């Protein structure tokens, strides 16, 4: 018999019982903390979410980090005025108190070639991160096959450059191989104030599978949003349920420590 993770309300109860003094809270952003928007620039971070993250950062002794496909500089803009520890760019960047590491950029010519897929009226949106390039087709789903062919041709035109394609929710991202969120989290957990704590991660997409995979070896717990992954402690229905769970955890621990 397959044991399924505990769903929404019960998962929220489990989450609320976590001991903030002993965990490292690791949070995906798009589709987890905030709702996915038609384009990456259209997302919104509400003040109550900022407040919950600020309180939880204090309660965990600073062991709260964002784990995102976005570059860290974009995360800083989204969550301003806070500059939280982060694994950015699907593991291409890591910051604890400063940017510790960053992957080598993809060649400009390759990025330019890939970006040519965003023809006028196609609905395809280019997100050039330097070390990777993401092509969002949420507004032009009919172009997915053409987009995959374009990416394959672009990679073939640069045989000396090792790349791989990371699929996500209506997005295809060309990046360096062996760069992923899981390895980024593993490295993050080596640094204070994360070292020695139990990592608790919430994610929603196939791009988060590498984190779920490393959690058992780190003694951690994983929660997902809207879909089932193996080995999880629970599943939240939607980002609003995640935000409510964070608010509940922040409030309960805040009350106990006051």
Language-model segments: residues:
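A structural signal for isolated positions on well-ordered beta-strands in alpha/beta enzyme cores
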Residues: 24, 63-65, 164, 200, ...
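Asp-based phosphoryl-transfer active-site loop
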Residues: 18-38, 66, 185
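Substrate-recognition "cap/lid" segment bordering the active-site pocket of phosphatases
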Residues: 87-113, 166-196
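Charged, glycine-interspersed solvent-exposed loop segments at helix/strand-loop junctions
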Residues: 124-142, 163-175
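Mg2+-dependent phosphoryl-transfer enzymes with acidic/Ser/Thr/Gly-rich catalytic loops
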Residues: 2-8, 20, 46, 182-258
């Amino acid at each position: 018999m397959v044991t399924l993770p505990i769903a929404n309300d019960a998962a929220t109860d489990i989450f609320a019982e976590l001991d903030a003094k002993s965990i490292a809270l690791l949070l995906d952003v798009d589709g987890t903390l905030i709702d996915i928007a038609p384009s990456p620039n259209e997302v919104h971070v509400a003040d109550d979410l900022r407040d919950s993250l600020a309180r939880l950062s204090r309660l965990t002794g600073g062991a709260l980090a964002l784990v995102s496909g976005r570059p860290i500089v974009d995360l800083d803009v989204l969550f301003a005025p806070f500059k939280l520890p982060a694994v950015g760019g699907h593991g291409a960047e890591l910051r604890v108190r400063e940017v510790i590491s960053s992957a080598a950029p993809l060649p400009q010519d390759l990025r330019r070639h890939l970006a040519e897929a965003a023809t006028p009226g196609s609905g395809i949106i280019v997100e050039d991160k330097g070390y990777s390039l993401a092509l969002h087709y949420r507004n032009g789903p009919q172009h997915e096959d053409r987009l995959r062919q374009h990416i394959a041709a672009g990679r073939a035109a640069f045989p000396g450059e090792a790349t791989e394609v990371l699929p996500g929710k209506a997005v295809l991202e060309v990046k360096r191989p062996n760069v992923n969120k899981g390895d980024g989290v593993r490295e993050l957990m080596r640094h204070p104030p994360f070292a020695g704590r139990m990592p608790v991660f919430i994610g929603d997409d196939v791009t988060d599978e590498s984190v779920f995979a490393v959690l058992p070896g780190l003694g951690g717990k994983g929660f997902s949003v809207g879909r089932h992954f193996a080995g999880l402690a629970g599943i939240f229905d939607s980002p609003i349920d995640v935000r409510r769970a964070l608010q509940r955890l922040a409030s309960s621990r805040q009350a106990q420590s006051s």
